[in-house]
Amino acid sequence: MLGPMSEALQLHRATLDNGMRVVVNPDTTSPGVAVNMWYRVGSADEEPGHFGFAHLFEHLMFSGTTSGIASSEHLATIESVGGSANASTSFDRTNYFETVPAGALELALWLEAERLAHLAVTEANLATQREVVKEEKRQRYDNTPYGDLFDLLLDGRFGGEHPYGHPTIGSVPDLDAACLDDVTAFHSTWYRPDNAVLVISGCVEADEGLTLADKYLGAVPAATGDLPERIQGRVRHDNPRVVVTRPLPRTAVTRAWATPPITNPDNTHRRHGHRHTRIGDELTAHSHPGKGTSPRRWSGYERLWAGTGNVGSSSVGTPQARGLRERTDRGCR
């Protein structure tokens, strides 16, 4: 059944028999089409001891299928028709996306259906992708100055027991200890049609997009049993102050405020945008580029259960670090 269309975007919605939700946005001005597959699973759904599983599957989903698609062939096939593909993991979702010429839409949908229904979760693929993720963590976090700043912020803002209290990149000890049975169970629990939203946007008519979605993704068998109930954690309100001393040439400062969840009607950019702008203006007005100060304006993370508003600088001198609290307080008023 088609849902209502918005005035800004021609959004046509349907739910397939297996529970998958589909959204089609026709845009005849585009020569290509984008396919986005959203799974409602992220690092917030990981159990203790399994930190990093959601992000691990971002990589495993490109490792081939039991139906004959070889490892890395998904990406190579998309690129062979002039398209691109990638994926991302966050706290509440994992997203896989392709952009292809309009004539390759069926190819992209077939590939998505194949890896949803027939993903090759094997010991060999697990071993390979585990090392890929560990190397990514070393390069982007462990061996980068201030690389774990956001991790410290999460722990300080939410606490280690909150679903948002650990980073999506995962834990190396947990990844090293991961066995095939645990990884397979995570996949079968969350990667199912009724936990997915397929979005098709670009050079495609609404009826054609919905028909093709049903042809390929609708053929994936429905899952049995209910999805797990997601646990909502409590946000910390004790406003901890964390100081880490390291042999780095300059000081990094970040402040974070708890904000309402994304479903809260108060959590709108229209309502809070002016305040965020004032905070950024305060930082920029007092920056000293010639002295190595590098202010970072407001950034926000709106999530299912809670959000954060972060502001700070990744490279400031001691006098600027001391004044950051006063200036951000002034911007909040």
Regions found by a protein language model. Name each.
Residues 34-99, 166-167, 279-294, 307:
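M16/MPP (pitrilysin/insulinase) zinc-metallopeptidase core fold and M16-derived inactive scaffolds
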Residues 2, 160, 164, 168, ...:
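An aromatic/glycine/proline-enriched structural segment found at the starts
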Residues 39, 66, 73-186, 232-233, ...:
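Acidic/histidine-enriched segments that form metal/cofactor-coordinating
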Residues 312-333:
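Extended amphipathic alpha-helical segments enriched in small hydrophobics
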Residues 254-258, 278-317:
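A structural supersecondary motif
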Residues 110-115, 210-217, 326-332:
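Short amphipathic alpha-helices in soluble, non-transmembrane regions
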Residues 2-31:
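N- or domain-start disorder-to-order transition segments that initiate the globular core
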